Amino acid sequence: NRIYSQSFYPFSYFTKEWFYNLHTGKGNMLLSIILLVSSISILFFIITGFKISLKSTLKNIKIKYLSSDKESKYVILVGSEKGNTFEFAKFLSTQIQSFGERVIIKPLNSYKIYNQAETFIILTSTYGEGDPPSNANNFVSRFKKFNQPNKINYSIIGFGSLSYPKFCAFAVTVDNLIRPTDNFKEILPLMKINRSSIIEFNRWIGMWNSSELTKIKFNEMKIET
């Protein structure tokens, strides 16, 4: 019952061993399984998150430029945080092109002078507590800076959710900004759409088609079943 040798390990040694076993699951099968499942889950969320982000970015890039700033009679300006509103813009631009008209889709932050423009269609969502989306946060200042040389007929559509108290608040801001401008003529009153409702969007199309200020008449968007 004699002790022939004795070694004392510092606290850092035990800490290192504890973290090593915790991260590797050494000596504990259940812990190893939990760590494996956790690692796979983290990898899954990283990959899917990257794919969603990339898809949203490419969606914005692919449909942004259809014609040039200098020759487009129709300008579709979009405010969107996640890119969903661009789908409605793309739907309208395709039909405008089918009539042989030149059209361009741009984010609201790219607002500038459009020498040939006659019609603006503005589609914008609202971010947070009534704030503009990230691609529209400079629109108000740019609108005040650039004066269009022609008379512009315009229509504004706001996208939002009635579950938020400030439903389509930024679209209201844009409407209040543009309406008093002398050379801008409102085609339709501000349209507010809840949760990207295609039914409500088609209601706007019906009103657009009935207006005497519109030359192009749109087909309704199909509801996917």
Which role fits each region the language model picked out?
Residues 55-125, 130-137, 141-145:
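N-terminal beta1-alpha1-beta2 submodule of the flavodoxin-like/Rossmannoid cofactor-binding fold
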Residues 5, 40, 82, 126-129, ...:
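Hydrophobic alpha-helical scaffolding
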Residues 25-28, 49, 79, 83, ...:
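Glycine-centered flexibility sites
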Residues 99, 116-118, 122-225:
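FMN-binding flavodoxin-like domain, especially the glycine-rich phosphate-binding loop
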Residues 3-6, 96, 190:
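Short hydrophobic alpha-helix segments
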Residues 1-74, 147:
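Conserved histidines in hydrophobic membrane contexts and catalytic metal-binding motifs
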